[in-house]
Amino acid sequence: MIGKVVVSVASILLIVGVAIGVVAYINKNGDANLSPQMKAVRGICEATSDKASCVKTLEPVKSDDPNKLIKAFMLATRDAITQSSNFTGKTEGNLGSGISPNNKAVLDYCKKVFMYALEDLSTIVEEMGEDLNQIGSKIDQLKQWLTGVYNYQTDCLDDIEEDDLRKTIGEGIASSKILTSNAIDIFHTVVSAMAKLNLKVEDFKNMTGGIFAPSDKGAAPVNKGTPPVADDSPVADPDGPARRLLEDIDETGIPTWVSGADRKLMTKAGRGSNDGGARIRATFVVAKDGSGQFKTVQQAVNACPEKNPGRCIIHIKAGIYREQVIIPKKKNNIFMFGDGARKTVISYNRSVKLSPGTTTSLSGTVQVESEGFMAKWIGFKNTAGPMGHQAVAIRVNGDRAVIFNCRFDGYQDTLYVNNGRQFYRNIVVSGTVDFIFGKSATVIQNSLIVVRKGNKGQFNTVTADGNEKGLAMKIGIVLQNCRIVPDKKLAAERLIVESYLGRPWKKFSTTVIINSEIGDVIRPEGWKIWDGESFHKSCRYVEYNNRGPGAITNRRVNWVKIARSAAEVNDFTVANWLGPINWIQEANVPVTLGL
């Protein structure tokens, strides 16, 4: 059937979200004697994780208009996070001068991330406006920000090492976590409702509130591809369009959803001073020999403008930069490129075990708090060693991160993919325990995963995803067309040291391995439980079409899914897992979605 289907967001909310919720509520409770206001409230709250809290929050709102109810819920969530932030500050004050360096560091970090959460919630409320008909294709971006708001709160708790303090803060911020969780559920219901009607968010016309019927084009096929090749550089790419993993990857290896201007930057920023530095004009140049504007990377970051609509381009010339680099939240759209991942190296030694006043989040050699970060031909290293325990090489908290041809070297917690949507291609990442971990939607393609030798008696786990809410949040790690191999120092003991593809850090941990070569360094069981927890019973672990001695699945744990068809992993392709791409459409840049 050809033709337009015109329907507003509010209509979807009211007809599908609210109506289905009310029917479900009435069927369950047998009570049809509800006021219009309570019908709307019960309908909206039916899909939330904590219905009682949701209803209690919305009961005082004297309206049955979904626009006003959902807006009121967001404002209540913002108020709750303000209270959580105040509670954290008060707790730090109550500890007085006797507070330990680690507790002070983590509480200061908590105050910072609560500030980030409040900023994002204020943006959400502003973007929502007074009429939900106007949010159109913003729905998924709002949901992405809400996911970040939730993650900021869990970041605070995850970084607290002391049990008593974690319990105190956990109880103090419980209300804001519940409200944020419910807010995510409400937005998830909206998106799911549109899916039930076979409508797509990106089809919304913001000015009219209407949408077109969805395209009938099929999903891009998943190709087996070829394994990457390890050398002194990051992993070599397969040649030619016939070997593209997805229709969303062009002949340069860059996703088509990256804007035209950024694609040019990625293409021009080649390895070596005779290639990259000469081909694009950097905003700032960093050089240890004084030939640039700055001698440290942090100085260049500090010089970049805040809330930049364009790109701040930093060329880091060859050299080892022994510094910790922090990119604040307002320093968005920074693009760093070096002269080679082994030539331009940012290195630092900071760890939870050996550095007083350090948390996992604060241990990162490079810490990216901002959106739109890009990097190419740079090495990121934490030199704390296995005795340092958690020691992050890079932590990326910002949405829309794109990283190519880089190295990440460390031991425990090397690559912290902690928030937003992140895409990595042709990287090398090495480590021991949970060395690719976080709470983001991340795809790593055509990369070399190197399992290292840690402390005596220590096991290795490649991944540790932190999804706490399941399908309502798009959080999970995807490794596609990668190679998983032992480091040279581990090779002789690779069959003795226990190494696994991952373990579930949180209740709904999500990790997918697709079209990858898995060496015999990985044990036949494949995956490990998180000691003391039952997260393996609810996690979502999937393997599809892998190869190599470590990919044999007949002895796998019984809680991993072995997919037999491409359709079973289609949700985890770049197009689906890192989309929708409305954030590029809103920026009015060229984008190719399909063929």
Swiss-Prot record:
Function in brief: Acts in the modification of cell walls via demethylesterification of cell wall pectin. Plays an important role in growth of pollen tubes in female floral tissues, possibly via enhancing the interaction between the pollen tube and female floral tissues by modification of the cell walls. May be regulated by MYB80 during anther development and play a role in tapetum and pollen development.
Residues bound to substrate: T360, Q390, R503, W505
Known EC number: 3.1.1.11
Site (Transition state stabilizer): Q412
Notes concerning its domains: The PMEI region may act as an autoinhibitory domain and prevent untimely PME activity during transport. The PMEI region is cleaved by SBT6.1 (S1P) in the Golgi apparatus prior to cell wall targeting.
Annotated source species: Arabidopsis thaliana
Gene3D superfamilies: Invertase/pectin methylesterase inhibitor family protein (1.20.140.40), Single-stranded right-handed beta-helix, Pectin lyase-like (2.160.20.10)
UniProt protein name: Pectinesterase 5
Catalytic reaction annotation: [(1->4)-alpha-D-galacturonosyl methyl ester](n) + n H2O = [(1->4)-alpha-D-galacturonosyl](n) + n methanol + n H(+)
Tissue distribution of the protein: Expressed in pollen grains and pollen tubes.
GO terms classed as biological process: cell wall modification; pectin catabolic process; pollen tube growth
GO molecular function terms attached to this record: enzyme inhibitor activity; pectinesterase activity
Gene of this entry: PME5
Stretches for region Disordered: 215-239
Family: In the N-terminal section; belongs to the PMEI family.
Residues linked to a glycan: N86, N206, N349
InterPro entries from the UniProt entry: Invertase/methylesterase_inhib (IPR035513), Pectin_lyas_fold (IPR012334), Pectin_lyase_fold/virulence (IPR011050), Pectinesterase_Asp_AS (IPR033131), Pectinesterase_cat (IPR000070), Pectinesterase_inhib_dom (IPR006501), Pectinesterase_Tyr_AS (IPR018040)
Motif RRLL cleavage motif per record, residues: 243-246
Active site as annotated: D413, D434
Pathway: Glycan metabolism; pectin degradation; 2-dehydro-3-deoxy-D-gluconate from pectin: step 1/5
